[in-house]
Amino acid sequence: KDFLKLSSASAMLFGLKSHGINFSYLERPYDYSKNNSQYMGDFAAPKINVVKVAFIGVGARGSGHAKQIAAIEGTEVVAISDLYNDLAMKSYEACKKIGNGNRHKNIAIYSGGENKWKVMLNEVKPDAVFISTNWDNHAPMAIETMKSGAHAFVEVPMATTIEDLWEIVNTSEKTRKHCMMMENVNYGRDELMYLNMCRKGIIGDFLHAEAAYIHELRFQMNEEKRGTGSWRTHHYAKSRGNLYPTHGLGPVAQYMNLCRGDDNFNSLVSFSSPALGRKLYAEKNYDSEHKWNKLNYSNGDMNTSIIKTNLGRTITVSYTHLRAHETRP
């Protein structure tokens, strides 16, 4: 916790000053954690023989989670919440089919309103909740989930502000509930194979790593009817830097055994290129009065961050949400 209070704030300050943003508030002393509670890093929740699972958000991402969890023995899908009833029903039918009449028999549906998920938490009382919504809702939904008595599993990123991250930590400690960010790349077969090689000493001394999140995502600007992806566009106007570092950085941190006693992140510098790609895409594909042509895109087309660890090892983390070619229509 002391590491989070000191080094994470200083690393953000050191790296993000390169963007000309005022982060002086990070330099002020602040009692982030007020619980004086037990550290949750080594906490093991009591075993649950049949885990009652609920889902908030079952669009392109959440629907996949619903099917995967429903297929695991020892789970019982008890509720699904989404803004749109047809999406909720699609996952409902998929889970029922996977249950084959033996499991997932009583799935409650909560749809049609932005706060139906709160009603779900209050009425169903699940053991675990999987959250796959837009970024801004991740933290408040995770916090309310833990307060309701359930463990929270949250899509990337877990939160978008330092204050929300600390509220998640405090709530987890107070409620004794897990809150896990579902950084799936940490658990990919290729990544786990390489991690195993690192731990067996096959790779040798690990001195430098390069990680990246490189996608063409401008096509999501077209998903306006239901906002399934277009909500990202606003973040490119209000945020700067690497908005999605953990896909690449998570596995690398494991390879280097960071945050586990041997070594840790020490300092960071971060620079972004000018932001031109989304502006040009908007001008080409939408009329001049369209909302996408009214945004001041500030998130650079390419961000490069360099991290140095306590032992002097280095990591380069690259990020872009556009490519020279489009990978989807």
At which residue positions do the language-model features occur?
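Active-site beta-strand termini and strand-to-loop segments that position acidic
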Residues: 305-311
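Short, small/polar residue-rich loop motifs at catalytic or cofactor-binding pockets
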Residues: 301
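Predominantly a Rossmann-like dinucleotide-binding segment in NAD(P)-dependent oxidoreductases
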Residues: 57, 175-180, 185-297, 305
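Short helix/strand-capping hinge loops at secondary-structure junctions
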Residues: 149, 155-157
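Short, mixed charged/polar active-site loops
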Residues: 314-316
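Conserved small/polar residues in nucleotide/adenosyl-binding loops
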Residues: 320-329
